[in-house]
Amino acid sequence: MSDVEENNFEGRESRSQSKSPTGTPARVKSESRSGSRSPSRVSKHSESHSRSRSKSRSRSRRHSHRRYTRSRSHSHSHRRRSRSRSYTPEYRRRRSRSHSPMSNRRRHTGSRANPDPNTCLGVFGLSLYTTERDLREVFSRYGPLSGVNVVYDQRTGRSRGFAFVYFERIDDSKEAMERANGMELDGRRIRVDYSITKRAHTPTPGIYMGRPTHSGGGGGGGGGGGGGGGGRRRDSYYDRGYDRGYDRYEDYDYRYRRRSPSPYYSRYRSRSRSRSYSPRRY
């Protein structure tokens, strides 16, 4: 019986030994499986984290680039605006300067109240019958004269009611202005002052140069002369001299507006007429 027990015991040990090597690899396999799974998960997580970081960085770079470009464009536009504003005063000055004779006449209005002393005196408010000889007799009492010039109308040949007296010395012109200002000459009270222009305005003829719109005095022959179409006679300096030029300018402006309307107005008028006379459709 002892031999049989020993054999049985040896068989059990051999079975247990044969089972144990087969069991251990299963554990090793499970360990290897768990180990292989966990690094793959870690690598995937790290990759996704790195991707999200790279995306966030690229987005932040894009946003920063956009902000930079916006701020840069805004600064450039602000610079352009500031440059354009800096040129506006010079542009306004250029536009304000006009080369018309009316603007040149208006430039003297600021210093007309207090002109600078000079050798040229302007005599205003003269009668139509006062000549250069009469003025020379009056003003030669105060000192030697270099010239006397009565301003006549180029077309009619009549006096325009003012003249220029030229002295050789300023002291004589001062004395003449103080004493002759307000005196009566040929029934008219004259005004004497320092002249600003020192000569007559040649562009202003003194009468209306356009076509006569109403009947008036008949025109002269080849010598030129005659009335200008029912105009008013005024002898004072401001009426016959400077203001007559303004009246002529206003008449010309009115005549131009009356004969040649603006193209926008003509278009609007033609459209309104075509619409008003168009037949209605029922």
From Swiss-Prot:
Ranges of biased composition (kind: Basic residues): 51-84, 92-110, 268-282
Cross-referenced InterPro entries: Nucleotide-bd_a/b_plait_sf, RBD_domain_sf, RBM, RRM_dom
Keywords: Acetylation, Isopeptide bond, Methylation, mRNA processing, mRNA splicing, Nucleus, Phosphoprotein, RNA-binding, Ubl conjugation
Primary localization: nucleus
Coiled coil residues, start to end: none
Keyword presence, NAD: no
Modification Phosphothreonine, positions: T24, T88, T202, T204
Chain segments carrying region Disordered: 1-118, 201-245, 260-282
GO CC entries: intracellular membrane-bounded organelle; nucleolus; nucleoplasm; nucleus; spliceosomal complex
Example GO biological process: mRNA splicing, via spliceosome
Keyword Nucleus: yes
Membrane-spanning parts: none
PANTHER family named in the record: TRANSFORMER-2 SEX-DETERMINING PROTEIN-RELATED
Function: Sequence-specific RNA-binding protein which participates in the control of pre-mRNA splicing.
This protein's name: Transformer-2 protein homolog alpha
Protein's organism: Homo sapiens (Human)
Gene designation per UniProt: TRA2A
